[in-house]
Amino acid sequence: MDINYKLYLITDRSFLNGRSLAECVEDAIKGGATLVQVREKNISTRDFYNIAREVQEVTTKYNVPLLINDRIDIALAINADGVHLGQSDMPIELARKILGDDKVIGISAGNVKEAIEAEKAGADYVGLGTVFFTGTKKDIDEPIGLAGLKEITEKITIPSVAIGGINKENAKSVLATGVDGISVISAILKNDDIQGASKTLANI
C-alpha cells in the first residue's frame, strides 16, 4: 500500500471539548492530514469499534488510510488499513500472520536498536520518539531530540514518522532530520480551527 506519511493525525478525544471526533478528523483531512490513526485507551471493545467505524466513514470518503492503535481485533473487524504497535504489544511477526501482507504495520521506536529490529521484523514504518516533551504521554523517557531522530533515520530504510511535542514552530526542523512525516495530536486537535491548524502543518 502506497502511503503518504507527511501529516499523520493520531486521535485523542480528550482534546475535543465535546466536538465530534469524526467531524474533527474530517476537518483535519480537509486541511491536509494524509494518514489517520485511531488511538483509544481504557474504553470497551464495543465503544472502540463504534468510534473506529465512525472515523472510517470519513477516511474512506477522502481516500485517506486508517490505522488502529494496538488493537488488531478492531483493525480486523472494520478492515482498517493496518495497525500501529508499541514495543510492549504483539510481536510484528505474529501481527503479520494475523493481518496478512497487504496491511500496514507500524512500530514505535525510541532508539536505533528498536528501529533496526522493527525493520528486520517486517514493519512497514516506524514512529520515532518521543522527540520533544509532550502533554499527551506522562510516563515517557527522556526525549530523543532532533539529533536522536537524525541518527535513527540514517540507520533504516523504511519510512519513519516523528512523534512527540511536534507543532508548527518546530515541524520544519523535525522534517529536516530526514523523517518522512510528522505525527501530531494536540497540534491539530487542541485548536478551535482544526482545518486551519492542519493546513499550516501540511504546508511546512
UniProtKB/Swiss-Prot annotation:
4-amino-2-methyl-5-(diphosphooxymethyl)pyrimidine binds at Q37, V38, R39, E40, K41, N69, S108, K137. Keywords: Magnesium, Metal-binding, Thiamine biosynthesis, Transferase. One of its GO terms (molecular function) is thiamine-phosphate diphosphorylase activity. It comes from Clostridium novyi (strain NT). GO terms for cellular component: cytoplasm. Belongs to the thiamine-phosphate synthase family. This is Thiamine-phosphate synthase. It is an enzyme of class 2 (transferase). Binds 1 Mg(2+) ion per subunit. Condenses 4-methyl-5-(beta-hydroxyethyl)thiazole monophosphate (THZ-P) and 2-methyl-4-amino-5-hydroxymethyl pyrimidine pyrophosphate (HMP-PP) to form thiamine monophosphate (TMP). 2-[(2R,5Z)-2-carboxy-4-methylthiazol-5(2H)-ylidene]ethyl phosphate binds at T134, G135, T136, G165, I185, S186. InterPro entries: Aldolase_TIM, ThiamineP_synth_sf, ThiamineP_synth_TenI, TMP_synthase. Its cofactor is Mg(2+). It holds the Pfam family TMP-TENI. One of its GO terms (biological process) is thiamine diphosphate biosynthetic process.
